[in-house]
A protein has these predicted regions:
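Beta-strand-enriched, solvent-exposed domains that form extended recognition/catalytic surfaces
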Residues: 1-33, 270-295
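Extended active-site neighborhood of metal-dependent phosphoesterases/phosphodiesterases
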Residues: 3-5, 11-15, 87-172, 196-209, ...
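Binuclear metal-dependent phosphoesterase catalytic core
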Residues: 226-295
Length: 295
């Protein structure tokens, strides 16, 4: 678990070697706009699927400029980087070093590709497919897609046992958010289990949100006390014809959040809002008040 207030330069993990008995992690201090009470903001993107597209500079710059100017704590990509070409290219577009902001990736169904096992290529570039990190007052958990285009090497049992151990290490009541490529459930109880006896009810661990992609739409739903949050693609727009955008989540000290979309491919745009045609209010001084929208 990467602790809050630090970043790793594209190395939040170490591959375990059976001959090595200790591992050192290089941590760099990083405030990321995290306030003293733990409140912060982060950026969510998904489904960029760049395996057969070019000219990504504009939307990548939009995200980089926003995270720098607004001091985002981190960027999370919830999967479908897409096939061998996308997996190899995306890390060059967006990584912790060139974004100057920690960026984390989930594995999606189209990121499980041909190899010894489905996530082999993903692991070689992006690291493990399940892990966690802290930012401010919240514990964030990254979990893998259950299956995809090729059979993964991990099983549901592997993820369950890791998740159970991860949750045992955090203070009781600490807010958690789970990132995955897809939604776990349509119901009010977010239960991850492998049989009738071995189950984790994430609601009991103060789950605030399940944040995902896969659907290619912008959609937020309250399921009991938990919000499910889906974000469409920032480079192509949504499957429902929604405008290209990335999501910003503003998290308070209790782990509760508000959300907004920031549109891509817009750069320093200014438009007159009022006066409208045929309506020109004049102040007592004789001046005309003009208001504008700036993006």
């Amino acid at each position: 678990t990467t602790p809050s207030g630090y970043k790793t330069n594209n190395k939040h993990y170490h591959r375990i070697d059976g001959d090595q008995i200790s591992y050192d992690f290089g941590l760099q201090p990083y405030s990321g706009g995290i306030k003293s009470d733990g409140s912060h903001k982060y950026v969510h993107i998904a489904d960029t699927e760049i395996f057969n597209t070019d000219n990504h500079g504009d939307w990548v710059s939009n995200v980089r400029d926003y995270t720098s100017n607004e001091e985002a704590a981190f960027i999370i990509h919830t999967g479908d980087i897409c096939y061998e070409n996308g997996l190899k290219a995306h890390i060059k577009l967006m990584n912790t070093a060139n974004m100057n902001c920690p960026i984390f990736y989930c594995v999606g169904n189209h990121d499980l590709v041909k190899g010894k096992y489905g996530e082999e290529l993903f692991e070689s570039i992006y690291g493990p497919v399940f892990y966690s990190f802290d930012a401010g007052s919240v514990h964030y958990i990254v979990t893998p897609m259950a299956g995809g285009d090729y059979q993964p090497g991990y099983t549901k049992e592997d993820v369950y046992r890791w998740l159970k151990n991860d949750l045992a290490q955090i203070p009781q009541g600490k807010p958690i958010v789970v990132f995955n490529h897809d939604l776990l459930t349509y119901g009010d109880q977010f239960i991850f289990g492998i049989n009738d006896q071995e189950q984790i009810n994430l609601n009991d661990h103060n789950l605030k949100a399940w944040v995902y992609g896969h659907w290619h739409i912008n959609y937020i739903k309250k399921q009991g006390n938990v919000y499910s949050v889906s974000t469409a693609t920032l480079d192509k727009g949504g499957i429902d014809h929604s405008t290209s955008a990335f999501r910003v989540l503003h998290v308070d000290k209790k782990g509760d959040f508000t959300s907004e979309l920031r549109y891509t491919y817009l750069d320093k745009s200014i438009q007159i809002s009022t006066p409208a045609e045929g309506q020109v209010p004049v102040l007592a001084s004789g001046a005309v008040l003009v208001t504008v929208n700036v993006y």
